[in-house]
Swiss-Prot record:
SUPFAM superfamilies: Positive stranded ssRNA viruses. Coiled coil: none annotated. Belongs to the cucumovirus capsid protein family. The modification N-acetylmethionine is found at M1. One of its GO terms (molecular function) is structural molecule activity. Keywords: Acetylation, Capsid protein, Ribonucleoprotein, RNA-binding, T=3 icosahedral capsid protein, Viral nucleoprotein, Virion. This is Capsid protein. The N-terminal arginine-rich stretch does not seem to be the major RNA-binding region that allows formation of an infectious ribonucleoprotein complex.
Length: 218
């Protein structure tokens, strides 16, 4: 046998199997694969349909978009009688409204129940006409027209309902800081009278970064 034949025979020789054998896939492995596939489908679904002003979603804490920061407004609703309403326009600080052409990407509402909270409230953000006086009748009509997605927040024995946030994406609308006065937070006290010491609302407006002062206030 010449050298070439010897080499060919070596190549054709079957590789010796490794010692031992791999165990059959366990049920845990199969469950993990199914879970991974479900998470993959969920991620694709979320990526395809990001929340908009008409389709908000509950979210956990999120980082601001690159190049953006946020300004928070704290609202303490006054006493609201049972089946009555409250509305407050989004009024940002002067130091922010000075840059009224900076774009706004998202608005988030966070509901913070105080220890005495034992009610059910509906909360939303609506773009309202400048002529609207946010009267009870006007707010009632906006809740009733079905055009406003609503966060229903109810008393929870643990103190905080699992879903206490509502996010609106305004990116597609090219809204800016100057437009924020056209938006208002609306509250409906459904089952009980809401007292002044029961609830605090935090509104986070995510907008393009603005210059910050390097001088301490006098």
């Amino acid at each position: 046998m010449d050298k070439s034949e010897s080499t060919g025979a070596g190549r054709n020789r079957r590789r010796r199997p490794r010692r031992g054998s791999r165990s059959a896939p366990s049920s845990a492995d199969a469950n993990f694969r199914v879970l991974s596939q479900q998470l993959s489908r969920l991620n694709k679904t979320l990526a395809a349909g990001r929340p908009t002003i008409n389709h908000p979603t509950f979210v956990g804490s999120e980082r601001c978009k690159p190049g953006y920061t946020f300004t928070s407004i704290t609202l303490k609703p006054p006493k609201i009688d049972r089946e009555s309403y409250y509305g407050k326009r989004l009024l940002l600080p002067d130091s922010v409204t000075e840059y009224d052409k900076k774009l706004v990407s998202r608005i988030q509402i966070r509901v913070n129940p105080l220890p005495k909270f034992d009610s059910t409230v509906w909360v939303t953000v609506r773009k309202v006409p400048a002529s609207s006086d946010l009267s009870v009748a006007a707010i009632s009509a906006m809740f009733a027209d079905g055009a406003s997605p609503v966060l229903v927040y109810q008393y929870a024995a643990s103190g905080v309902q699992a879903n206490n946030k509502l996010l609106y994406d305004l990116s597609a609308m090219r809204a800016d800081i100057g437009d924020m006065r056209k938006y208002a937070v609306l509250v409906y006290s459904k089952d009980d009278t809401l007292e002044t010491d029961e609830l605090v609302l935090h509104v986070d407006v995510e907008h393009q970064r603005i210059p910050t002062s390097g001088v301490l206030p006098v």
